[in-house]
Curated annotation (Swiss-Prot):
Domain of life: Bacteria
Name the record gives this protein: 7-cyano-7-deazaguanine synthase
Pfam families, per the entry: QueC
GO biological process, any: queuosine biosynthetic process
HAMAP family (alphabetical): QueC
Catalysed reactions, as listed in the record: 7-carboxy-7-deazaguanine + NH4(+) + ATP = 7-cyano-7-deazaguanine + ADP + phosphate + H2O + H(+)
Family: Belongs to the QueC family.
Gene Ontology molecular function terms on file: ATP binding; ligase activity, forming carbon-nitrogen bonds; zinc ion binding
Positions of ATP binding: 8-18
Keyword vocabulary terms for this entry: ATP-binding, Ligase, Metal-binding, Nucleotide-binding, Queuosine biosynthesis, Zinc
Length: 224
């Protein structure tokens, strides 16, 4: 069976991506990153998703992005209740570049030619490393910078959610049997994974379920 490395944050998008990769016949190797995020509930969720969806292996890599800083997700910066103009303070500098690079390294080691990530450019917070241009550019980099790209069969970077609305992602996940109840999307989730209900991630998630007409299994502290 062909192998793929899938970035797994513990959120609803990455859970849906695992299911889509499996539907395409890939044996999924899930990679999560402990990058110094302020809460660990998303990594707990990643472990639940990996177990529930039967991945071949789930690796957690430590990278201390708190030492670089610059984000409300790693620093003592207040997470806003809603997105504003421009790139928000919840953007983590170079996060997707770093995570995809780690996935790329693991892919070479295990002989996988495919990387999957859950970036989205429709219902998203405006992060520059979620755009289609970024995904295409990283695939070019992957094939220039690796032995597998230069001497092997080449590497492909898949972003199957990039042009889907949040509602479409919910529908696809439900179709594939994803248990969204074990996922965590909130920027301010507590230790038990309860979502705050009013950050940008919570708003997008709640709207996705509402627009899809599917009950939202998320445990919210308060939903505004």
């Amino acid at each position: 069976m062909k192998k793929a490395v899938v970035l797994l944050s513990g959120g609803m998008d990455s859970a849906a991506v695992i299911a889509l990769a499996q539907e395409q016949g890939f044996a999924v190797y899930a990679l999560s990153v402990r990058y110094g995020q302020r809460h660990t509930s998303e990594l707990d969720a990643a472990a639940r998703v990996a177990a529930a969806q039967g991945v071949i292996a789930h690796k957690v890599v430590d990278v201390d992005l708190r030492s670089i800083g610059g984000s409300a997700l790693t620093d003592d910066i207040e997470v806003p209740d809603a997105g504003g103009d421009g790139i928000p303070v919840t953007y983590v500098p170079a996060r997707n570049t770093i995570m995809l690079s780690l996935a790329l390294g693991w892919a070479e080691v295990i002989g996988a030619n495919d990387l999957f990530c859950g970036v989205n450019a429709v219902d998203y917070s405006g992060y520059p490393d979620c755009r289609p241009e970024f995904v295409r550019a990283f695939e070019v980099l992957a094939n220039l910078a690796t032995k597998a790209g230069v001497e092997g069969a080449g590497l492909r970077v898949h972003a199957p959610l990039q042009f889907l609305s949040k509602a479409d992602i919910v529908r696809e996940g439900v179709r594939l049997g994803v248990d969204f109840g074990v996922t965590v999307s909130c920027y301010r989730a507590d230790a038990d994974g309860r979502a705050c209900g009013h950050c940008d991630a919570c708003r997008l998630r709640a709207a996705g379920f509402a627009d899809a007409g599917i009950p939202d299994p998320t445990h919210y502290a308060i939903l505004s």
